[in-house]
């Protein structure tokens, strides 16, 4: 579908289709959305596989390890007794093929800004930081060598009561000051929404 309309594509770590198959079907460079694991060797293996598949950039997802409120989820009582672990367990994802995922978590809360440099040591892909919502973090991303940022709140589900991403743009644009591209996602439902984001300084939506 993306190929048919000439649209760019970013493939998630959680994709149910192998990155090589998606890249071949798209017939143009795609990007890889990385959920960093708490085992660096596995993260490196995923980066190198994505690059070998033809990905030209990686979007490092940083907005999930936050202290999100999970009280409602903890109270959930399922009436359906079917086991859905086949859908959600790590080994089921094609990107993990050949990797030892026992005990591996997809949210590495120990990440620091140094991860940008570490990633650049093991891949030639451009490194973008996905999940930036404030100007301070945007400036730090530039300072530590990020090639771009994605203003994102993960659809609003990672941290509750956050601002809409378009509301975050002005301070982020000011902090970046044209030094790297700024992409924004979330809540864009019509063309006029896109024009608003571009007029506020986003490079792309």
Please report, for each region that a protein language model flagged, where it lies by residue:
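Alpha/beta enzyme core
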Residues: 4, 21-25, 38-184, 191-205
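Beta-hairpin (beta-strand-turn-beta-strand) motif
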Residues: 14-16, 35-37, 63
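Active-site cofactor/substrate anionic-group-binding motifs, chiefly glycine-
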Residues: 1-14
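Short catalytic-loop micro-motif centered on adjacent basic/acidic residues
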Residues: 9-11, 31-34, 127-129, 183
């Amino acid at each position: 579908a993306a190929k048919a309309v000439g649209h760019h594509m970013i493939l998630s770590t959680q994709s149910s289709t192998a990155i090589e198959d998606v890249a071949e079907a798209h017939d143009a460079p795609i990007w890889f959305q990385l959920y960093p694991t708490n085992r660096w060797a596995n993260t490196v293996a995923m980066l190198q596989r994505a690059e070998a598949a033809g990905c030209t950039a990686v979007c490092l997802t940083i907005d999930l390890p936050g202290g999100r409120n999970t009280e409602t989820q903890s109270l959930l009582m399922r009436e359906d007794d079917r086991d859905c672990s086949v859908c959600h367990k790590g080994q089921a994802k094609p990107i993990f093929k050949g990797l030892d995922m026992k005990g591996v978590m997809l949210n590495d809360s120990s990440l620091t800004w140094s991860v940008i440099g570490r990633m650049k040591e093991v891949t030639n892909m451009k490194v973008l930081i996905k999940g930036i919502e404030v100007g301070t973090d945007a400036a730090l991303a530039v300072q530590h060598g990020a090639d771009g940022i994605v203003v994102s709140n993960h659809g609003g589900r990672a941290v509750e009561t956050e601002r809409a991403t378009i509301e975050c743009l002005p301070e982020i644009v000011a902090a970046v000051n044209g030094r790297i591209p700024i992409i924004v996602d979330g809540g864009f439902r019509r063309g006029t929404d896109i024009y608003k984001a571009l007029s506020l300084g986003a490079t792309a939506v």
